[in-house]
């Protein structure tokens, strides 16, 4: 990839890092509304980062004429599509807060391993020179969700232990068409799963605190 094409990646990632909530990873005792606000903010930043990464990877590696057919083939690629998690806001509103938190935790934990290999597919890009930054952000969100679960624990069965699964690692062989398609698919799933987690958290926050920002 040409040096000029790396610039948007670097600028986007740098901006998101600057906007990331301070004292990341720390969830001291605080009001429930603050726990939800922090978790939602982290999920929003991660979803935006995933969406921008997917878009830039697509622009750099996937010919425009092939994108539509490839995207259709990716529909059944994400393992998260095989679990009984809500697929949108309306379905999420029919689930309890604890169910949504457990699905959110499952989605986040499924990416903790794969994101540690991101730097291997972006070896010429400063954006993912250290993939542990993305890993740390996922860990921050994981801790935030776990803090909420502790506050709302209701004794219901834990689905995460039954459905827990992870994605394959990203493929570093960027000269292979198969590897490019695999990484493209993984980034698509990363974006979709973080969008789901963000949606679940926002639904919970809105129905508990009836905010004007609930229209999303």
From Swiss-Prot:
Signal peptide span: 1-26
PTM annotation (Phosphoserine): residues: 131
Residues involved in Zn(2+) binding: 45, 198
Cellular compartments per GO CC: extracellular region; extracellular space; growth hormone receptor complex; nucleus; plasma membrane; secretory granule; trans-Golgi network
Coarse class of the protein's main subcellular location: secreted
Entry-linked Pfam families: Hormone_1 (PF00103)
Disulphide connectivity of cysteines: 78-189, 206-214
Gene Ontology terms: biological process: animal organ development; bone maturation; cell surface receptor signaling pathway via JAK-STAT; cell surface receptor signaling pathway via STAT; cellular response to alkaline pH; cellular response to insulin stimulus; cellular response to thyroid hormone stimulus; cytokine-mediated signaling pathway
Gene3D superfamilies, alphabetized: 1.20.1250.10
Subcellular location: Secreted
Keywords: Disulfide bond, Hormone, Metal-binding, Phosphoprotein, Secreted, Signal, Zinc
SUPFAM superfamilies the record matches: 4-helical cytokines (SSF47266)
PROSITE patterns registered for this protein in UniProt: SOMATOTROPIN_1, SOMATOTROPIN_2
GO molecular function: cytokine activity; growth factor activity; growth hormone activity; growth hormone receptor binding; hormone activity; metal ion binding; prolactin receptor binding
InterPro entries cross-referenced by the UniProt entry: 4_helix_cytokine-like_core (IPR009079), Somatotropin (IPR034975), Somatotropin/Prolactin (IPR001400), Somatotropin_CS (IPR018116)
PANTHER family, per the entry: SOMATOTROPIN (PTHR11417:SF2), SOMATOTROPIN,PROLACTIN (PTHR11417)
Family, as annotated: Belongs to the somatotropin/prolactin family.
Biological function: Plays an important role in growth control. Its major role in stimulating body growth is to stimulate the liver and other tissues to secrete IGF1. It stimulates both the differentiation and proliferation of myoblasts. It also stimulates amino acid uptake and protein synthesis in muscle and other tissues.
Protein name: Somatotropin
């Amino acid at each position: 990839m040409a040096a000029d094409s790396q610039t948007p990646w670097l600028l986007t990632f740098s901006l998101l890092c600057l906007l990331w909530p301070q004292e990341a990873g720390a969830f001291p005792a605080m009001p429930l509304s603050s726990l939800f606000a922090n978790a939602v903010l982290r999920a929003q930043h991660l979803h935006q980062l995933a969406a921008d990464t997917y878009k830039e990877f697509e622009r750099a590696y996937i010919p425009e004429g092939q994108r539509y057919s490839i995207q259709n083939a990716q529909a059944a690629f994400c393992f998260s599509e095989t679990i009984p998690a809500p697929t949108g806001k309306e379905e999420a509103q029919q689930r309890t807060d604890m169910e949504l938190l457990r699905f959110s935790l499952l989605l986040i934990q499924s990416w903790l391993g794969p994101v540690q290999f991101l730097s291997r597919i972006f070896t010429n890009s400063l954006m993912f020179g250290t993939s542990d930054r993305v890993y740390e952000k996922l860990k921050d969100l994981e801790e935030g969700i776990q803090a909420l679960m502790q506050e709302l624990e209701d004794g219901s069965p834990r689905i995460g232990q039954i459905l827990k699964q992870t994605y394959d690692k990203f493929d570093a062989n960027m000269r292979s068409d198969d590897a490019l398609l695999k990484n493209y698919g993984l980034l698509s799933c990363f974006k979709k799963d973080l969008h789901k987690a963000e949606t679940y958290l926002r639904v919970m926050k809105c129905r508990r605190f009836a905010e004007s920002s609930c229209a999303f």
